[in-house]
Amino acid sequence: MFKNAKEFVQYANKLKTLREKKLNGVSIYVCVGTGCTAKGALKVYSAFEEELKKRNLLGQVTLEKIDDDKVTLNRTGCCGRCSSGPLVKIMPYRFFYSNVAPEDVPEIVDRTVLKGEPIERLFLTDPLTGEKVPRIEDTTLFKNQDFYIMEAIGESECDSIEDYIARSGYESLVKALTSMTPEEIIETVKASGLRGRGGGGFPTGLKWEFTRKAQGDIKFVVCNGDEGDPGAFMNRTLLERDPHLVLEGMIIAGYAVGAQKGYAYIRAEYPFAVKMFKKAIEDARKLGLLGENILGTGFSFDLEVKEGAGAFVCGEETALLASIEGKRGMPRPKPPFPAQSGLWGKPTLINNVETYANIPRILRDGVENYRKRGTENSPGTKMFSVAGPLKATGIIEVEFGTTLRDIIYNICGGFVEGEEFKAVQIGGPSGACLSEDFIDMPLDYDTLKKADAMVGSGGIVVITKKTCMVEVARFFLDFTKRESCGKCVPCREGTMQAYNILEKFTHGKATYEDLKTLEHLSKTIKTASLCGLGKTAPNPILSTLKLFREEYIAHIEGECPSGMCTAFKKYVINPDICKGCGLCARSCPQNAITGERGKPYTIDQEKCVKCGLCASKCPFKAIELV
C-alpha cells in the first residue's frame, strides 16, 4: 500500500521498465473478451498454458518478476475484431493471428514462439483489400480508427493493475489529488468539451459542476454500465479490457464533486465485466488507490459493484438509482435532477462507462490533445459496435465527424457478397433508421439531432435491401414495449397499440387508416411519455415512416418490397419435383396439405399458416416460398 504519491511514482517507474523488458521478450497475448471467449478463446489459452508447461517454457506472468528465457502468457481484452476471434498476438514480433484453434497452438509455439517465424494462414484478413496482413496495425481496419481510450490493442493485460500502472495508469489520479483543486479538474473537463457518451450528449463538465455546487455533506458517484441496447457492447468491452481506466475516472470524479462513495451499476448478463471490475476495485484498494486516505492526501473514496437485473429501463438514470436503492427500477419525473437529489435524496453524479474512461487521458495528455479529435461541438472519439452483413464487424473507435461511409466501407470493408446497402439503424432500439441519403453525414451529436437521430450508446446496425423496414420498426418496438416499466399510460399502452398496428402491416392486414393512426399514435407517445424510454420508443417508427414510407404503402397494397414478410408469399409444391411421398402432409400442423401417394400434393392456402415446416421436411426441395 502506497503511503504517498512519491512511493507510487517510484513503483510506476519500476513497472514501466519491467513492462518494456517484457514486451521485448517473447510474450503471448490471448484475447479473452466475451466475443473471443464465445468462439473458444479460453480453450486456446489453456492449450498455450499446457503446451508451454510441457516444454518448460512458461514463465512468471506478473511484472514483479520476469523470468529470462521464458515465455509469458497473458490475457488481453477485446481487440475490436470480434468476428475473427479467437485472436492471439505474439510479442515482440507483433504477429496478430485470427481464428486460432487449440490445434494451432503447437505450431505457433514451434514456429513463432521459438523461431520467430510467421504463420501466414493465421494472419488477419484486411477487410478492405482481402489480403492477409501479419500485424493488425497494418490493416485498413486499424489505420482508419483513432484509439484514444482503446489503447494498447492486443498487448495489455485485462486482469493486471501492474500492467495498467505501467501504461501510465493512475498518473492522472495522482496529478488530480496532489496538484489540482476540484474546481480546476471541473474546469479542465469543461474546457475539453467532453459530452456524455450514454446517448444524451450532455456536457460532462457542467454535470460535474452542478453536483459539486449542490448542497449536501454526502454525495455519490455512479457509473451507468447498464448497456441494454440489442447489439451494443461498447461498455462491456471497456469494463472487460481496461477496468482500471473506468475506475480511475470514477475516483477522479469523486474527488472533483466531493463524493465519498461510488457505485458501478453493471448488467448481471455481463459476468466477465462484473468479475474484472470487482477485481480492479480489490486490487486498487490493496495498493491504497481506493478507500481511506488515498495516497496520504486525506481524500477518502470507495466503490462497490451493483449488478443490474437486466431491465432496459434501468439505463434511465432515475430508474437506475431506484434499483441501487433496492426498489423497482421505475423512472421518476425531473426535476429534481440526480445532481440535486439522487441516491437516497443526496446529490449524485451519474456518467456512462465510456465517459469516465475519457477522464484519465484528458488530465494526462491535456485538453488540446483531446480537442484535436472530433468536431468543434463534439470533440474526441466514440466507440461504436457495428453489426450487419459486412466483411468485418465488432467494436471500433473513431473520431466524431466520421461518416457512415467511412465506417461501412473504409473500416469494415463493405458488404459481403450478394448484399447491398439500404439503411443504418443507429442509437439502439430508441434510435432512428437512416437512408442512403445520410451515408456521408458526419456522425456527431448535433448533426444526428438535426436528422432526428441520436448517437445513443453507439450501436450501429447496417441494413441491406433484403430487409423490410416495417419489420425493423416492428422488431425494435417489440423490444421497447416489453421493457416498458408500465408507469405511464402513453408508453405502456401506446407502444402496445403501435406494435399491434405494425403486426397488421407485416401480416398484410393494414389499411390507410392504420397508417394514419400509427403516425399520430407514435407522435403522441413521443410527446406524452414520462421518461427517455417512452419518448424515444417511437423513433424507429417515425424515422421509417419519414424515409421509407413507400414500404408501408406497399404493405397496404399487398406487397413486401424486400420479400421478407411471409404473409405476402405462399408455399407451393412444384409438381415437377414432388415425388408424392406424403412427408409434408404428415408434418403439417394445420392439415393444409393433401394428395394421393405417388402423385404431386397440393397446399390449401386458406389453411396454410406459412410456418415452413413442410419445406424443411421435404427431402426433394419441392416446396417453394413464392
UniProtKB/Swiss-Prot annotation:
Required cofactor names: [2Fe-2S] cluster; [4Fe-4S] cluster; FMN
Catalysed conversion reaction: 2 H2 + 2 oxidized [2Fe-2S]-[ferredoxin] + NAD(+) = 2 reduced [2Fe-2S]-[ferredoxin] + NADH + 3 H(+)
Residues the entry annotates as binding [4Fe-4S] cluster 2: 578, 581, 584, 588
Binding-site residues, FMN: 207, 224-228, 312-317, 350-352
Residues reported in the UniProt entry to bind NAD(+): 198-201, 229
Record bears the keyword Metal-binding: yes
4Fe-4S ferredoxin-type domain residues: 569-598, 599-626
Protein's cellular compartments: Cytoplasm
Top-level lineage group: Bacteria
Alphabetical list of InterPro entries matching this protein: 4Fe4S_Fe-S-bd, 4Fe4S_Fe_S_CS, NADH-UbQ_OxRdtase_51kDa_CS, Nuo51_FMN-bd, Nuo51_FMN-bd_sf, Nuop51_4Fe4S-bd, Nuop51_4Fe4S-bd_sf, Thioredoxin-like_sf
Major location category of this protein: cytoplasm
SUPFAM superfamilies: 4Fe-4S ferredoxins (SSF54862), Nqo1 FMN-binding domain-like (SSF142019), Nqo1 middle domain-like (SSF142984), Nqo1C-terminal domain-like (SSF140490), Thioredoxin-like (SSF52833)
Residues involved in [4Fe-4S] cluster 1 binding: 485, 488, 491, 531
EC number in record: 1.12.1.4
Free-text cofactor note: May bind 1 [2Fe-2S] cluster per subunit.
SMART domains to which the protein is assigned, alphabetical: NADH_4Fe-4S
Keyword field: 4Fe-4S, Cytoplasm, Flavoprotein, FMN, Iron, Iron-sulfur, Metal-binding, NAD, Oxidoreductase, Repeat
GO-annotated molecular function: 4 iron, 4 sulfur cluster binding; FMN binding; metal ion binding; NADH dehydrogenase (ubiquinone) activity
This protein's GO CC annotations: cytoplasm
Residues that bind [4Fe-4S] cluster 3: 608, 611, 614, 618
Description of how the protein assembles with itself and partners: Heterotrimer composed of HydA (alpha subunit), HydB (beta subunit) and HydC (gamma subunit). Near neutral and acidic pH conditions favor oligomerization of the heterotrimeric holoenzyme.
Task of the protein: Catalyzes the oxidation of the physiological electron carriers NADH and reduced ferredoxin, coupled to the production of H(2). Acts as a bifurcating [FeFe] hydrogenase, which uses the exergonic oxidation of reduced ferredoxin to drive the unfavorable oxidation of NADH to produce H(2). The beta subunit contains flavin- and NAD-binding sites and is potentially the site for NADH oxidation, with the subsequent shuttling of electrons to the alpha subunit.
Record family assignment: Belongs to the complex I 51 kDa subunit family.
Protein name: Bifurcating [FeFe] hydrogenase beta subunit
Annotated organism of origin: Thermotoga maritima (strain ATCC 43589 / DSM 3109 / JCM 10099 / NBRC 100826 / MSB8)
Lineage: Bacteria, Thermotogati, Thermotogota, Thermotogae, Thermotogales
